[in-house]
């Protein structure tokens, strides 16, 4: 089988066939570029001769046959070949055990799941994956979130997905670590420009240029892109502007480089919508807008130096500055059981005094007023009960995060007796400063689902309203954190075919919160200082009895310290609506994950790659955001134990010169292992419904064995690539996933009754196909077509149970159901879904000049 310069078509790695799919993707990409180049490697496994970085910093370079885990890799050619608009799209289509939840319904804001652990841009999502760029941790200090839009896809040279709780990757590596390496002018010389356009107002342009000097070792690389789309859903435009640059100097003994990344992005993701409304209009939205503005600066000074034939040093020093502003228009669920239509005499007088006219003197009701507003306006003027009479709420947040740090490690090749050693010892220091402010303003829902705000004494949710249910949504929090780490790894060659790895890392973290609104540490104050420390070990072994098969097994531990947002929102007596409110809190514990995995991988006759593996990850004191009611309020708590275990299988074959195909299958069992009682107002099995008061606030009981929502049990990925000539390439890939319970249905017992509760409480299984075509009319030029969701399948990858405040005609309605025996008005509850994108096509033109 022909080989590519980077990776042979045959690799013994354990990446699921999705990885294999990428391997082929890379192979076809290379072949498509020139008449005679060998096929590139796919996202599958690494070749036997290829080495991978087994730690964030360079230096721990191990042949893949010595890595005791199902590591997956991919290159920039793999991503280009699949026409993936961003990193997360590529991973979801091409890498084994990876799925996404499009909770925000924006392509650049997904939750990325790997083996049931998540890296998400959304506060409140349990984070369990660490992400690194050139050795710098990208999980942000505030909530460990990952903003996928902040780094340009085209700057990525390669990625490595490391499974398990590998302690070498530090905090938050509970289920895995994603390590990204960027391009440079030595390995990526030349110039490229690309333009694209497609449906839903999609337009984009990107460029890259790089080079190096043979005389003095200087090298440089720059890439940038601009992208806009109107979005396929109502009022959902997004704009991305990204720039990455690197300059460095290579000497005979090493390299020094300085890289910079800038991002200026405006994202709109209008989230979930009630199931019935989606059936009527798949592009409809519940309320608008849901805007996120990210501005980011990233600087990284990195070096690698060979100190001798056996000893080397690598290190970096970095600085990040991220500004995030959000502006969200939401339904105020507190109004759904209130009388919000006809203003009373005092309210009419206040309206008249303020100069309003046209308000009804009598008779306003749900039947004749689809979008009520007058009682809301009057209660804002009176500062009386806008929290109950206004059906809209505008939430705004401002987050500023500065984090900086440095790391260094020594790598030594040594021999003791007959045993060879690959030793790595390192240290790291990371610090951050965070400021977070928030406010909420009352308003009313317009027919277009936007929120109109009103000026007046009661305009803001500051707790001053004359209402027993008044709440204060203001937050003014500052936080500082410091983490110091020491780590060590030793890979021992017990025999030429057997390698044992021992590793460990010690982390010490301090988090200090300062509350500007309620200082002093008393009741309701966010002030506090929290310290967490832990040593996490790892052990693994590989045995390669022949070049065609490798056995591996291992066990490791990772941990995660609670962040400022979790430490400030942990009191069940004062739930938060993330990111709307914080409260004084009881202490939280670190999350500790222990992972066991074993498997084998191999190749047959240079034409077949395969892998099979099993894994189990047990979380102790898992940090979960527990919903308190249907409107999104809740709190963080340590949740006893959870477990993710599963099977991974992959296959990649090349049956003929022009054909490559394969796939991977992931079977995941993600469950709660501890009994717990949590809020479950949207769930038909809640305690209130059991007591004869459906549609009102209640709790649900989670039992050991109940499945964690939004993590499909079965995921199958298949691909086939056809390259009839050097000028043409056609690729087809498919992702199929089983249905899952939605959030709020943690006990799996929600069932519709058609009146108080609607929707199934689950997502349905689905299969989505994607088609790509490349044509190279002449050297350097490429025209491409990409169609996603080829058969226009309606599907959802995310959902939750929540209040349904709209009729089948799209009108807002309060007190939609008659009062119960207790005099309380039930609120209809439904299943809300974040709809998947419909069939979308775009075309592009790329020109590449590699120079001499």
Predicted regions located by residue number:
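Gram-negative outer-membrane beta-barrel transporters
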Residues: 407, 411-412, 495-496, 500, ...
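Periplasmic plug
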Residues: 104, 110-163
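C-terminal beta-signal and adjacent terminal beta-strands/loops
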Residues: 2, 559, 736-748, 774-852
């Amino acid at each position: 089988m022909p080989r590519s310069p980077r990776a042979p078509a045959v690799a013994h790695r354990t990446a699921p066939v999705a990885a294999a799919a990428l391997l082929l993707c890379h192979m076809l990409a290379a072949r498509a570029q020139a008449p005679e180049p060998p096929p590139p490697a796919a996202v599958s496994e690494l070749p036997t001769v290829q080495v991978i970085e087994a730690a964030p910093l360079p230096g721990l370079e191990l042949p893949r046959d010595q890595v005791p885990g199902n590591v997956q890799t991919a290159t920039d050619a793999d991503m280009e070949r699949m026409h993936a608009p961003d990193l997360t799209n590529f991973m979801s289509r091409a890498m084994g055990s990876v799925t996404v939840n499009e909770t925000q319904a924006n392509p650049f804001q997904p939750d990325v799941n790997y083996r049931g652990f998540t890296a998400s841009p959304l506060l409140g999502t349990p984070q369990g994956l660490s992400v690194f760029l050139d050795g710098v941790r990208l999980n942000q200090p505030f909530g460990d979130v990952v903003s996928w839009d902040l780094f340009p896809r085209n700057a990525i040279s390669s990625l490595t997905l490391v499974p398990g709780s590998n302690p070498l990757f530090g905090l938050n590596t509970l289920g895995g670590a994603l390590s990204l390496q960027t391009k440079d002018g030595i390995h990526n010389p030349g110039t490229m420009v690309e333009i694209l356009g497609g449906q839903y107002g999609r337009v984009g342009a990107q460029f890259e240029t790089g080079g190096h000097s043979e005389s003095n070792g200087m090298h440089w690389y720059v890439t940038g892109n601009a992208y806009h789309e109107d979005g396929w859903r109502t009022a959902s435009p997004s704009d991305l502007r990204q720039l990455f640059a690197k300059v460095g100097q290579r000497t005979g003994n090493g390299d020094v480089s300085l890289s910079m990344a800038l991002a200026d992005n405006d994202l709109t993701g209008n989230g979930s919508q009630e199931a019935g409304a989606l059936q009527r209009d798949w592009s409809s939205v519940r309320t608008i807008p849901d805007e996120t503005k990210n501005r980011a600066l990233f600087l990284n000074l990195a070096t690698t130096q060979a100190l001798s034939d056996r000893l080397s040093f690598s290190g970096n020093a970095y600085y990040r500055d991220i500004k995030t502003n959000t502006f969200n228009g939401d339904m105020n669920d507190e109004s759904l059981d209130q009388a919000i239509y006809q203003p009373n005499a005092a309210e009419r007088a206040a309206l008249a005094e303020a100069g309003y006219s046209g308000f009804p003197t009598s008779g306003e009701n749900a039947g004749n007023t689809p979008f009520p507003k007058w009682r809301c306006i009057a209660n804002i003027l009176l500062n009386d009960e806008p929290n109950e009479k206004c059906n809209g709420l505008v939430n705004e947040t401002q987050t500023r995060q500065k984090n900086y740090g440095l790391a260094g490690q020594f790598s030594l090749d040594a021999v003791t007796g007959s045993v060879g050693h690959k030793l790595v010892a390192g240290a790291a220091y990371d610090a951050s400063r965070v400021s977070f402010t928030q406010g909420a303003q009352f308003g009313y829902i317009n027919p277009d689902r936007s929120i109109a705000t009103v000026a007046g004494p009661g305009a803001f949710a500051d707790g001053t309203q004359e209402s027993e249910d008044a709440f204060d949504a203001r937050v003014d929090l500052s936080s500082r954190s410091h983490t110091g780490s020491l780590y060590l790894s030793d890979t021992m060659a017990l025999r030429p075919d057997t390698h044992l790895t021992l590793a460990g890392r010690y982390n010490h973290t301090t988090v200090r919160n300062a509350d500007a609104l309620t200082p002093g540490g008393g009741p309701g104050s966010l002030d506090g200082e929290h310290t967490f420390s832990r040593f996490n070990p790892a052990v693994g072994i590989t045995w390669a009895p022949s070049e065609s098969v490798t056995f591996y097994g291992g066990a490791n531990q990772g941990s995660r310290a609670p962040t400022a947002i979790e430490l400030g929102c942990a009191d069940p007596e004062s739930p938060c609506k993330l990111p709307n409110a914080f409260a004084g809190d009881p202490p939280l514990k670190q999350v500790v994950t222990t992972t066991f995995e074993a498997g084998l991988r191999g190749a047959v006759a240079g034409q077949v790659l395969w892998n099979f593996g099993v894994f189990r990850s047990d979380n102790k004191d898992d940090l979960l955001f527990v919903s308190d009611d249907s409107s999104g309020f809740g709190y963080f708590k340590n949740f006893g134990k959870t477990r993710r275990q599963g099977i991974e299988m992959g296959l990649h074959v090349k049956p003929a010169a022009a054909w490559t195909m394969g796939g991977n299958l992931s079977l995941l069992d993600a469950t709660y292992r501890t009994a717990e009682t949590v809020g479950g107002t949207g769930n038909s099995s809640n305690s209130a419904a059991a007591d004869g008061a459906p549609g009102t606030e209640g709790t649900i009981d989670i039992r050991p064995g109940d499945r964690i929502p939004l993590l499909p049990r079965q995921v199958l990925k298949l691909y086939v690539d056809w390259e009839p000539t050097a000028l043409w390439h056609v690729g087809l890939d498919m992702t199929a996933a089983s249905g899952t319970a939605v959030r709020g249905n943690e006990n799996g017992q929600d069932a519709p009754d058609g009146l108080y509760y609607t929707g199934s409480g689950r997502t349905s299984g689905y299969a989505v196909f994607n088609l790509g075509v490349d044509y190279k009319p002449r050297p350097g030029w490429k025209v491409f077509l990409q169609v996603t969701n080829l058969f226009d399948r309606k599907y959802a990858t995310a959902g939750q149970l929540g209040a349904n405040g709209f009729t089948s005609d799209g009108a807002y309605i309060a007190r939609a159901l008659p009062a119960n025996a207790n005099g309380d008005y039930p609120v209809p509850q439904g299943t809300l879904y974040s709809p998947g994108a419909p069939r979308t096509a775009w075309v592009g033109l790329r020109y590449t000049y590699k120079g001499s």
